[in-house]
């Protein structure tokens, strides 16, 4: 199966309307748009560009999200208190299951890296499986080790 490398200009990507749930809006009329740029082969991770106009809203994260601000700014208020202004170049990580209040004074555009989480035992099993495949793959490329392995 062929896998392609994806390149995009996040600042210039055309986006599609992606409204915020009306229940999440605290004030203003924020308009959001987004576009998925790429998705992993196993469908558990993807990259998207997202932008929002002025407003205040809560965002409930149902998957892990890491974002990089491309342009504009926002003020984030965390569930446990604390407030932080973010702007171009800032990186933020939101674990699945958290909520954050956003105040976008004018506009913000970000690139988001989203990942569906899985229970620890499943994640550990996937890591172990991948390691086993790497070991077997390494053996398969070494004629000496392959011969020794097949001999027994």
Segments (PLM) and residue ranges:
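Short acidic-glycine-tyrosine-enriched beta hairpin
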Residues: 80-96
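Double-stranded beta-helix
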Residues: 42-43, 103-152
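Conserved short histidine dyad/triad with adjacent acidic residue
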Residues: 43-61
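A generic "binding-loop/recognition-motif" signal
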Residues: 53, 82, 98, 106-108
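A short, N-terminal "cap"/entry segment at the start of jelly-roll beta-barrel domains
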Residues: 1-44, 147-152
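Short hydrophobic/aromatic-rich beta-strand segments that constitute the beta-sheet cores
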Residues: 59, 76, 110-113
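Short, conserved beta-strand element in jelly-roll/cupin
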Residues: 52, 61-76
């Amino acid at each position: 199966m062929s896998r392609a490398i994806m390149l995009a200009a996040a600042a210039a990507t055309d986006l599609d309307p992606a409204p915020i749930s009306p229940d999440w809006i605290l004030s203003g009329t924020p308009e959001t748009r987004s576009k998925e740029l790429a998705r992993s082969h196993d469908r558990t991770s993807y990259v998207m560009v997202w932008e929002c106009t002025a407003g205040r809203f809560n965002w409930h994260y149902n998957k892990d999200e890491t974002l990089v601000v491309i342009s504009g700014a926002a003020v984030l208020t965390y569930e446990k208190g604390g407030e932080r202004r973010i702007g171009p170049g800032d990186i933020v990580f939101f674990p699945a299951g958290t909520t954050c209040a956003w105040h976008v004074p004018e506009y913000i555009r970000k690139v988001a890296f989203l990942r569906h989480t899985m229970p620890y035992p499943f994640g550990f099993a996937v890591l172990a499986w991948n390691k086993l495949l790497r070991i077997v793959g390494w053996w398969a490329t070494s004629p000496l080790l392959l011969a020794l392995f097949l001999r027994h």
